[in-house]
């Protein structure tokens, strides 16, 4: 059975959503990142980058949420766009846009606003600006069509959902007013029964919630290892 290594963070939840939507049997394996589970040798043997999510499917190992969604979509044939070169090009382009842009800029905006030991105006402005810019591109896309790729719900929408459902946390209260079409899609996805099942995974394991010194050391090693 496929093993799914996860935490309650946005990127693992994208994969949890696919697994629950698809009905693919899987074994959830919690990785408590605030306790440092991601740095244990048995986990870095699966993902040398010490991040979640990852999956092990027989003799196949895949890490990074975007790669996992592509793998699972191709494996099952579910939640994929039409089998045309045009649709394939759009799928890959928007998956990479989300993986390399929406996700990282959202994460860094949250980090510098909420977790950095000092408020650095330049860093906050840069990452919040870039997060806004990326969501603006998505908004323009969704103003013209119902879903990110084609006229059906695909893994691209799941990939977007992971971070986009947290827009008020990323960009601040009132941010939804700027992105009504993004909100429309996220509200539609949130209403799907699979979302409730995916979210329930977080309650199956009592993940550490305290952001104490142990958590900081486990999640943000640069705070304790000066290299520049």
For each of these PLM feature ranges, what is it?
Residues 1-129, 139, 216, 226-228:
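GST-like domain detector, emphasizing the conserved glutathione-binding G-site
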Residues 32, 155, 202-204:
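Short, solvent-exposed turn/loop segments enriched in Gly/Ser/Thr/Pro and often Arg
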Residues 45, 191, 200:
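Phosphate-coordinating loops and pocket residues in cytosolic domains that bind phosphorylated ligands
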Residues 73, 163-164, 199:
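Active-site-flanking alpha-helical
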Residues 86, 94, 98-193, 228:
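GST-like fold's C-terminal all-alpha helical module
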Residues 107-108, 200-202:
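Short coil/turn segments at secondary-structure boundaries
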Residues 202-228:
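Acidic/histidine-enriched, glycine/proline-rich intrinsically disordered or flexible terminal extensions
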């Amino acid at each position: 059975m496929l093993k799914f290594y996860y935490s309650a963070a946005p990127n693992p939840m994208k994969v949890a959503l696919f697994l629950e939507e698809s009905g693919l049997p899987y074994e959830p394996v919690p990785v408590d990142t605030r306790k440092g589970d991601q740095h244990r040798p048995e986990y870095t043997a699966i993902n040398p980058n010490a991040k979640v999510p990852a999956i092990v499917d027989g003799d196949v190992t895949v890490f990074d949420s975007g790669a996992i969604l592509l793998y699972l979509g191709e494996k099952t044939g579910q939640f994929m766009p039409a089998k045309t070169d045009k649709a394939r090009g759009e799928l890959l382009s928007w998956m990479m846009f989300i993986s390399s842009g929406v996700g990282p800029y959202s994460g860094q905006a949250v980090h510098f606003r909420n977790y950095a030991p000092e408020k650095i105006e330049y860093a906050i402005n840069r990452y919040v600006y870039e997060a806004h810019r990326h969501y603006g591109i998505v908004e323009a896309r969704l103003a013209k069509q119902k879903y990110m790729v084609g006229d059906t719900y695909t893994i691209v929408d799941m990939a977007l959902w992971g971070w986009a459902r947290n827009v008020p946390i990323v960009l601040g209260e009132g941010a939804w007013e700027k992105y009504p079409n993004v909100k429309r899609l996220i509200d539609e996805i949130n209403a799907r029964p699979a979302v409730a099942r995916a979210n329930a995974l977080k309650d199956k394991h009592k993940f550490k919630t305290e952001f104490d010194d142990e958590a900081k050391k486990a999640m943000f090693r640069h705070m304790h290892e000066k290299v520049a």
